[in-house]
A protein has these predicted regions:
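Glycine/charged-rich beta-loop-alpha catalytic/anionic-binding loops adjacent to active sites
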Residues: 23-24, 60-63, 86-92
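Histidine- and aromatic-rich ligand-binding microenvironments
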Residues: 4-5, 34-35, 98-99, 132
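Active-site neighborhoods of divalent-metal-dependent phosphate/nucleic-acid chemistry enzymes
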Residues: 69-115
Length: 132
């Protein structure tokens, strides 16, 4: 099982240089979880870059090409996300700098006791377990 952050999805869908590593990690997972907040963020980024039709590619990747479980943002995650922001939030921790969507991914990983697949250095400055 793994939780996937928006950054990893965007790397794959935008065919960034490290896309293959993220795609391989997703293919190897027996269960894929993503916060509804992170789906929303990914959709916004893709739409801003490629127009409204980019949402179709996102849904196809999540639900046809892969079997992602889109997890609603609930009270337990909200509490964990707020605690994460208090420790690692943008403007609080100069190394982690987590934003709202990052905190949602962090919270889902913590509440599900699962590693997180992400791109970049923000999560490496936290206590979250990384997938790769």
């Amino acid at each position: 099982m793994m939780v996937v952050d928006s950054s990893a999805l965007i790397a794959i869908l935008e065919q960034e240089s490290d896309a293959a590593a993220f795609a391989a990690a997703i293919q190897q997972a027996d269960r894929l979880l993503i916060s509804a907040v992170n789906v929303h963020e990914t959709g916004i980024v893709l739409r801003a870059r490629h127009g409204i039709a980019a949402a179709d590619r996102l849904w196809r990747f999540l639900q046809v090409e892969n079997d992602f479980e889109i997890i609603p943002f609930d009270e337990a995650q909200a509490r964990e996300a707020l605690a994460a922001f208090d420790r690692y939030g943008k403007g609080i921790d100069p190394k982690a700098r987590l934003n709202l969507s990052d905190c949602a991914a962090y919270a889902l990983a913590r509440t599900m006791n699962s590693p997180l697949l992400f791109k970049g250095n923000d999560f490496t400055a936290t206590d979250i377990k990384a997938c790769i």
